[in-house]
């Protein structure tokens, strides 16, 4: 019974493979392997799994499966050939040629093997020629750089730039490494000349990119400490280049194996985790080193943000995060608690504290259980206590600044720190200080503390008078603006709920007016003006404030200019204000019955502001578009900064979706680069943010020419986000818009259709063809009609044992004219490309003839034409089918249509009758017609 089950599953897998369902075939073969299969059966199953992986383009697994088959049967030529195919794709040509030579020796007359051997031999010769020329080029560059007689720096710079280009190719990278190139590059780094240092760092990027062994060799030669120390130089461009190099090294050590290397690995890495920890340990040490530039410290934080936390919470291993918390949490807090003005021991920038907050937040979010979180809290509290107790006023300032850093990041840890003995009292006391820097630290802490509704209520009761006093009496704008933001934050504690206002009517409008005034004041530095945006981000929950804000052209211009400044920490506040103005947050209309019930139970019911109705929102969106919001957002998306967090990206996605809601606004968004900016938002960020961005992409793809909206290769990047909208967890509208957009893309080129197929969209599109909602059903049928131009989709329709063709025939007879048109178009396409399908149409339903006749008798000329083409294809495919058609009323219908004008319908009908005459089924009349 087991043997028959294995055989049955193998045959089932073979059928699925023939139908193009490679994932299903793979599952069948895997299930068969789990049974008690004989060694011979196991060899066949592994060989078949290799074929599936080749089709799925997973060449590493294809090689593994083929090797397992060869272990069972060394003379299995199919397995040898499949392994050679996988090895060729992996770039291991020398191993691939050995397998092909064995294939040829086993089957000398097999022309496929001979041709494959000739092709791969040509590739090897080409690679040898290229390697030879590359060797010469690398040596030439080295001679110029090493020549002590060469005084001209321009020639040396050109040589070093050529090395950068060569190192991007595998052969050049290998040659550079073998020719003691890393030692030479180290000498370039030691020169201290910016141009030469940049060229050396970029060459090292090429050497290490996606190659674990070369990365380890480079670190071994240069020294991890030396590489990391380059981050701390004063030159911003050199520090950024070093940051890029370290990111490439992290990728090579952490994920390089998964990406598929170019060429063979030249060394075996016993424990890449050790190399990772050494790199991270050096980065943590750099954070607290005196003499390191502020930009370098920010870059180190950025690297830690990207490298340490898990990419997905589904990954069970968070050991690296736990190790960093134990070894480096105090060092991160050291940066978060440092003051920019007056400068302390550690040089920091305006963005350093925000970067530290983001890193702390990501580390905290990466923890899995209460014990791990409790350890995090304990370390933070111990650090704050160590500064707060017994260190005088300077220590208290440092402690409060650290609390602010935590409140901006892992706010749970920040709130617990606020509850430590004396901290809140210290904040209140320092607000009354005569020293500006002390007041700044205290007021900022008070602002961040007001984030929670519970604490906001406490501060409203106890701290509002203090903030008002600071706002009215302070002579320093930097203090007044922060006090104002504190008041703004407390005034917006009710959110969008019109019935919950913390302050008297009109107070929020006065606060907003002052915020706009400061925002427009160019004399105030960007770091201080950022706080005005923070205030507006809170106040724009109020619809009256939104209306005044979008009417203020100068304020909008200042806002967009500030978003382009070096003050990166303003991005979230800008995005928050724009989300509020466009009402692009999620809002569900409450059920009227539930509202009545809540009122009866005397429960609070949120009320919407009258100026938040759709007509007001649409007007605000148009004003923002006219003010240039799209170009500002495009710039924000391009920002390479940890401040552009997943939540910030989500806000930008929400705004874009609101901007493209109206069809007439989409041209403006596309013209200012919005289409290109949406692609990265749809590929990275929170699930909600990616979905919103994908939906905005779908709207643009539906109403504008995709080739103009997404020029060049970008159009292929749009496919994956659109396919993600087909998942069942998306709304019906999102499904519909994705189908419409994919229909447009599928009609452009075969390469785009192949991309859609590769993203496994066809099964989902087929599923929606059975959807009850008529618009979704119609859109999916139209999409399938365009995809039917691809050979793979035609194979699916031609495969035995499925109802795909039947569904199209039945839909061609539906009452929905648009659905009819899509289905009939698909039928016309398929019967033209695959004549064998013509003979199967009469088999799928007994109503086929009625359906075709109804198409030809339709008043819609498009339906008539599609029906006439289907009938013509069937007549040309088989005399037997033609006979059946001519014996029915179809002949009379065709005769009438053939007497019309010179339309496509007339020509198709006449061609049907001519073919019937040729078969001898009918006779031409006396007039020769």
Swiss-Prot record:
Lineage top rank: taxon: Eukaryota
Primary location group: cytoplasm
This protein's record includes keyword Repeat: yes
Keywords: Acetylation, Chaperone, Cytoplasm, Developmental protein, Differentiation, Myogenesis, Nucleus, Repeat, TPR repeat
Residues modified to N6-acetyllysine: 55, 468
Residue windows of the TPR repeats: 6-39, 43-76, 77-110
Record SUPFAM superfamilies: ARM repeat, TPR-like
MF annotations from Gene Ontology: Hsp90 protein binding
InterPro entries: ARM-like, ARM-type_fold, TPR-like_helical_dom_sf, TPR_rpt, UCS_central_dom
Compartment(s): Cytoplasm; Cytoplasm, Perinuclear region; Nucleus
GO biological process terms on file: cell differentiation; chaperone-mediated protein folding; muscle organ development
GO cellular component terms attached to this protein's record: nucleus; perinuclear region of cytoplasm
Oligomeric and partner information: Interacts with PGR isoforms A and B as well as with NR3C1 in the absence of ligand, and with HSP90AB1. Binding to HSP90AB1 involves 2 UNC45A monomers per HSP90AB1 dimer.
PANTHER family in alphabetical order: FI21225P1 (PTHR45994), PROTEIN UNC-45 HOMOLOG A (PTHR45994:SF3)
Purpose of the protein: May act as co-chaperone for HSP90 (Potential). Prevents the stimulation of HSP90AB1 ATPase activity by AHSA1. Positive factor in promoting PGR function in the cell. May be necessary for proper folding of myosin (Potential). Necessary for normal cell proliferation. Necessary for normal myotube formation and myosin accumulation during muscle cell development. May play a role in erythropoiesis in stroma cells in the spleen.
Protein's UniProt name: Protein unc-45 homolog A
């Amino acid at each position: 019974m087991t043997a028959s089950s294995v055989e049955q599953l193998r045959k089932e897998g073979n059928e699925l493979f023939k139908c193009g369902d490679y994932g299903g075939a793979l599952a069948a073969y895997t299930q068969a392997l789990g049974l008690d299969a004989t060694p011979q059966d196991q060899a066949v199953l592994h060989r078949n799994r290799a074929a599936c992986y080749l089709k799925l383009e997973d060449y590493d697994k294809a090689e593994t499966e083929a090797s397992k088959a060869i272990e069972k049967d060394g003379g299995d030529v199919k397995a040898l050939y499949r392994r050679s195919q996988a090895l060729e794709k992996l770039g291991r040509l020398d191993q691939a040629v050995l397998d092909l030579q064995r294939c040829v020796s086993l089957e000398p007359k097999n022309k496929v093997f001979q041709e494959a051997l000739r092709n791969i031999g040509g590739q090897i010769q080409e690679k040898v020629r290229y390697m030879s020329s590359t060797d010469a080029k690398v040596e030439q560059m080295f001679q110029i750089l090493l020549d002590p007689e060469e005084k001209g720096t321009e020639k040396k710079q050109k040589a070093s730039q050529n090395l950068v280009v060569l190192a991007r190719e595998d052969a050049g990278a290998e040659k550079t490494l073998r020719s003691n190139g890393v030692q030479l590059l180290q000498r370039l780094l030691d020169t201290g000349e910016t141009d030469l240092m940049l060229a050396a760092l970029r060459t090292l990027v090429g050497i290490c990119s996606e190659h674990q062994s070369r990365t380890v060799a480079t670190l071994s030669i240069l020294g991890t400490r030396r590489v990391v120390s380059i981050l701390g130089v004063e030159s911003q461009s050199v520090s950024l280049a070093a940051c890029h190099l370290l990111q490439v090294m992290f990728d090579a050590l952490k994920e390089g194996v998964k990406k598929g290397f170019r060429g063979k690995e030249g060394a075996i890495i016993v424990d890449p985790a050790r190399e990772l920890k050494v790199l991270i340990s050096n980065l943590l040490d750099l954070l607290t080193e005196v003499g390191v530039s502020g930009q370098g410290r920010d870059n180190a934080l950025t690297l830690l943000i990207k490298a340490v936390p898990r990419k997905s919470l589904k990954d069970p291993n968070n050991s690296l995060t736990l190790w960093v918390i134990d070894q480096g949490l105090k060092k991160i807090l050291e940066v978060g608690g440092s003051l920019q003005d007056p400068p302390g021991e550690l040089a920091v920038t305006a963005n350093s504290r925000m970067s530290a907050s983001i890193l702390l937040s990501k580390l905290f979010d990466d923890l899995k259980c209460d014990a791990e979180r409790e350890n995090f809290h304990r370390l933070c509290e111990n650090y704050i206590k160590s500064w707060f107790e017994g260190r005088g006023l300077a220590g208290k300032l440092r402690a409060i600044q650290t609390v602010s850093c935590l409140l901006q990041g892992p706010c749970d840890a920040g709130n617990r720190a606020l509850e430590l003995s004396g901290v809140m009292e210290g904040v209140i006391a320092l607000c009354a200080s005569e020293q500006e820097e002390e007041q700044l630290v205290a007021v900022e802490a008070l602002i961040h503390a007001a984030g929670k509704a519970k604490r906001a209520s406490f501060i409203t009761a106890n701290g509002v008078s203090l903030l008002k006093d600071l706002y009215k009496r302070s002579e320093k704008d930097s203090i007044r603006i922060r006090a104002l933001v504190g008041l703004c934050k407390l005034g917006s504690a009710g959110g969008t709920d019109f019935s919950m206002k913390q302050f008297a009517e009109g107070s929020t409008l006065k606060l907003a007016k002052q915020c706009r005034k400061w925002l427009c004041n160019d004399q105030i530095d960007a770091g201080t003006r950022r706080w005005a945006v923070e205030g507006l981000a809170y106040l724009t929950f109020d619809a009256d404030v939104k209306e005044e804000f979008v009417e203020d052209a100068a304020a909008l211009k200042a806002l967009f200019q500030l978003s382009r400044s070096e003050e990166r920490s303003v991005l979230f506040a800008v995005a928050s204000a724009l989300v509020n103005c466009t009402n692009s947050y999620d809002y569900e209309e409450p059920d009227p019955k539930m509202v009545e019930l809540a009122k009866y139970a005397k429960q609070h019911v949120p009320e919407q502001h009258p100026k938040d109705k759709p007509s007001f929102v649409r007007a605000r969106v148009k004003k923002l578009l006219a003010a240039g919001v799209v170009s500002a957002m495009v710039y924000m998306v391009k920002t390479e900064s940890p401040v552009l967090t997943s939540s910030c990206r989500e806000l930008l996605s929400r705004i874009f979706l609101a901007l493209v809601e109206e069809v007439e606004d989409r041209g403006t968004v596309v013209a200012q680069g919005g289409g290109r900016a949406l692609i990265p938002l749809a590929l990275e960020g929170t699930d909600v943010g990616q979905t919103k961005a994908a939906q905005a992409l779908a709207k643009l793809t539906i109403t504008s020419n995709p080739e103009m909206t997404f020029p060049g290769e970008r159009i292929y990047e749009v496919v994956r986000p659109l396919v993600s909208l087909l998942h069942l967890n998306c709304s019906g509208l999102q499904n519909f818009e994705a189908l419409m957009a994919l229909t447009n893309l599928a009609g452009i080129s075969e390469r785009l259709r192949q991309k859609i197929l590769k993203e496994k969209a066809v099964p989902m599109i087929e599923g929606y063809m059975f959807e009850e909602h008529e618009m979704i059903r119609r859109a999916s049928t139209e999409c399938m009609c365009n995809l039917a131009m691809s050979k793979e989709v035609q194979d699916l329709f031609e495969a035995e044992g499925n109802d795909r063709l039947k569904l199209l025939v039945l839909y061609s007879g539906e009452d929905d004219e648009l659905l009819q048109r899509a289905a009939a178009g698909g039928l016309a396409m398929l019967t033209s490309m695959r004549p064998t399908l013509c003979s199967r149409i009469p088999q799928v339903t007994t109503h086929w003839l009625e359906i075709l006749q109804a198409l030809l008798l339709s008043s819609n000329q498009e339906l008539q034409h599609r029906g006439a083409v289907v009938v013509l294809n069937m007549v040309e495919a088989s005399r037997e089918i033609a006979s059946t058609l001519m014996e029915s009323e179809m002949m009379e219908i065709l005769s009438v249509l053939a007497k019309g004008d010179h339309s496509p319908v007339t020509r198709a009908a006449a061609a049907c009758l001519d073919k019937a005459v040729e078969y001898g089924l009918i006779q031409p009349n006396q007039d020769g017609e």
